[in-house]
Amino acid sequence: MSLSFKNIVFPEEWQVPPNDYIFIDDCYEEALQFNLFERGDEKSYTWMYHTISCCAYFWCKCSRSEMKLIGHLMLWTFLLDDILDSDKVNDAEAIEMIKRTEFIFIEGKLPENPTDLEKYTCYLRNEGLKIAGDREDMFNMFLTNSIQWILSIIPLNKSMEHKLPPHLQLHGYLRKLNVGVELCQGFTYLIFANNKVNPAIFNSPRYKKMLECTSMVVSHVNDMASYCKEVKNGGGFINSLLILQKRADPLSIEHSYQVIAEQTNAFIRDFIYQEKMLLESISDEQQNEVKVFLDHMKYLMKGNYLWSGTTARYASKSSPFVEMQKSLNVHLDNEIDASSL
């Protein structure tokens, strides 16, 4: 079977060369200081490399120092999410972990008996405060977006505990929060905290709609890329393709992809329309100020599309998508029985 991402159509101008990957080793060295990995553990390094390498596509024009902070923040999200997605913690432990992490973001200090990951969380939160400087509004948006993402993890995980898949609209609502687009935008608020954007723009319905469109495009492409990984790890009910395959009137993988691809292209078209209308409604000066944030949404959408076809995080010879059959690594096994497609 050879489905392809190529049915997803992006404007050509959205494609920008990825940033240098050198920031990954910068992050790795500092992560070792927080005891997050053991030096020489090739499997952990491979896992980290193929997760935070997405940053090179999402923030393709940032400096090395900016990329190091972004890389750390992205690493933190994957570390936290992978723990909560696994069987390493039970429900009570997961809820307590969420509460303690939220406390760190709000208070800027550590809870009692902090773990190494919590120390890392607090360090990054307070580094963000330094970078934001006197732009308390930008820092607060970073905090709020981060907390909302943290609080979305358990509800999304719980949505796949039922015998039947959730309705696609319910799944989409949860994924808009959990896929991390607004979280990534929060990182961008820190990096470009000195931009003189009128805060009313960030709160406008059009800007919010563009974030929603971006979230759904990233979510759908991620569902295509991670298809085999989700099947293998039992996370099928958080994958839109598998939801369509498992519902009462099941669709084939080919038909499921057609439905999701059409939805994705519709979100891209809506984003383009909303951007046009937003820019026409503000001054030339404000257009220049908000451009970096709108461009970042485009880099998230097209960058995720490009990165997904290169990372071994989701690669699988048994994937129905030809792009995912190429980039393989012995440390990341996503192979599944073809009969499950």
From Swiss-Prot:
Coiled coil: none annotated. A motif (NDxxSxxxD/E motif) lies at residues 222-230. It comes from the Eukaryota. Keywords: Lyase, Metal-binding. GO terms for molecular function: metal ion binding; terpene synthase activity. InterPro entries: Isoprenoid_synthase_dom_sf (IPR008949), Terpene_cyclase-like_2 (IPR034686). It catalyses: (2E,6E)-farnesyl diphosphate = (1S,2S,4R)-beta-elemene + diphosphate; (2E,6E)-farnesyl diphosphate = germacrene D + diphosphate. A motif (DDxx(x)D/E motif) lies at residues 81-86. GO terms for biological process: terpene biosynthetic process. It is an enzyme of class 4 (lyase). Pfam families: Terpene_syn_C_2. Its EC number is 4.2.3.-. Disulfide bonds: none annotated. Contains several highly conserved motifs that are important for catalytic activity including the aspartate-rich 'DDxx(x)D/E' motif and the 'NDxxSxxxD/E' motif, both of which are involved in complexing metal ions to coordinate the binding of the isoprenyl diphosphate substrate in the active site. Terpene synthase that converts its substrate farnesyl diphosphate (FPP) into the sesquiterpenes beta-elemene, germacrene D and a yet unidentified sesquiterpene. Belongs to the terpene synthase family. This is Terpene synthase 9. It comes from Dictyostelium purpureum. The gene is TPS9.
